[in-house]
Amino acid sequence: RDVMCMGAEVIACTDSFRFGDIKNQKTKWIHHGVVSGVAGYGNPLGIPNIGGDVYYNERYNDNCLVTLVTLGIVREDNIIHSYAPENADGHDLILIGKPTDNSGFGGASFASLELVEDEKEKNKGAVQEPNAFLERHLLKSSYDLFKILQKENLIDKVGFKDLGAGGVACASVELAETSGYGAKVDLDKVHKSMKDLHSSVYLCSETQERFMWVCPPDITQRILDHYNK
């Protein structure tokens, strides 16, 4: 997501896995989940996995390491930054992608926990509900929008960012604060698939299929129309 948000077309990925003792039953359980997760999401995107490695050592019995590398191509003068442009006072924040639910809430802290199978239901809310086919559509539509922005010399007028580990809170703050701004976020306008959740969930839940633009008001409707169509 970070590579795509720079205005690049993602062309390949690779991965590096570190698991515990290969004879350990817990290691086998974690190994199966990781490999299934990477394949189950990566394959529908149509992005080739060009390599990787895997090592087993008892030091990783309690906490595995999953390192992913993504490759993309973009011309230097077409790079989109993950912060608001200069003179961005009054710019709009646009949230695109999957409607918000209760999945992916607390995902950052969950990523550092020791995994225990008996607690998987307890931790389920921290795990994102994947929709790789929606992600593929978002990638393709974003690539088309990049070309429009390039053609009209608007690349330097916008910022683009994935929602990170803190959802809307993370994206809005990082887009604005990096350039010395603050941001007003109206959570009532966030598109939702589940109602009556605590406001902190709408603010902080993370999913792979959500991104945020910052742009001047005169092109806001064009970006909205582009994705909605």
State where each predicted segment sits.
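Glycine/proline-enriched, intrinsically flexible loops and inter-domain linkers
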Residues: 1-229
